[in-house]
Amino acid sequence: MLLTAALALAAVSRLVDAAAVAIDTRAVVDGEPTTVDRTLLFQPPDNYTDPRTLYARTVELSDGKLLATWENYSPEPPPVWFPIYESLDYGQSWTEISRVQDQVYGFGLRYQPFLYELPQAFGDYPAGTVLLSGSAIPTNLSETNIELYASRDQGLTWEFVSHIAHGGVALPNNGETPVWEPFIYVYEDTLIVYYSDQRDPNYGQKLVHQETTDLVNWSDVIDDVTHSTYTDRPGMPVVTKLPNGQYFYVYEYGGTSITTDYSFPIYYRIADDPRQFADAADHYVNASGYIPVSSPYAVWSSVGGENGSIVVSSGRQPLFINRALGDPDAWELYDDFDQPAAYTRSLRVLAEDDDFLLVAGAGVLPPSTTNNVTVSVYKISEILGL
């Protein structure tokens, strides 16, 4: 009996050791950051439905590993999922490691995924937990549900955590009531999820956030951006911290604010507290008369001078850089790079060296039968000509 138990314990020990070795081997990040010229991350099969892929997002984990996901238009049934791909060489090559499935409704995880690594513990989830937020939406688009999932093993397995927001039909029409486009950020002991909200009858769409300290219990909805004209549609919020301690909040402003035709120029606000953008002044990105439109993303890098560089992407090809902490008169346009326009490109400066800017895209809005997922890595200093 004791011998049997001892042998069993030894066998378990060997399995645990083998698993640890496998995990450690998988987790090794190879080499150093380098530039990458538009590498193909994922080519969807021919049976994928239009638009095939959209809305690529990435996260860099604390050990240098990169994860990527996107809207994935696989044929249904079965329900759609968010794929998780991993890079161990700073974006040069990628491998699928898991799929985040809808574990609650069975609708499928359909729209607008976002990845984030916890810098500190929240509730039962330790620092290093990877979070994914996105929308569970049925095939008929009859409702929207912004959900929170978590991975305790760097993206290999996933568990449902909580519901953040529920809305109506997934159509971007004024009068409908969906919720869209989550973005996660941690401030002090609070985790914030920013998103677009059409549920308020006073606004075609507004920008809001909700807060949590345990990933399970969420605050009431807090307004971030509202505009007095009902048909205005601020959307797609992204937040990044500046070196002076302020926070840069970028969004698209659907409306006629600066044009006679309805368009989506890129606006931004700057605040001392990322929970208090509602009273901050509006500015728009304008680089010598070129005003970018739609699907923004923003990051900050220390490269570019004493204030570093705010880098903004839009739905068009160029990047827009501000080296004066968001001064409205200091935007510069740069378009000498190969990563194509997309809905929507995401940006990431690499922690090992924030001169390296990773740009990911998954194609354009339908009809778009040639979409795929690509990644490029550039040096901001080279973009700036430094």
Residue ranges with predicted function:
Residues 19-54, 59-110, 118-174, 186-230, ...:
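Beta-rich carbohydrate-recognition and catalytic domains
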Residues 1-25:
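Fungal secretory targeting signals
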Residues 55-57, 112-114, 181-183, 236-238, ...:
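Conserved beta-strand position repeated once per blade in WD40 beta-propeller domains
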Residues 204, 235-236:
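His-enriched metal-coordination microenvironments in redox/metal-binding proteins
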Residues 6-13, 175-178, 192-193:
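Long, low-complexity intrinsically disordered regions
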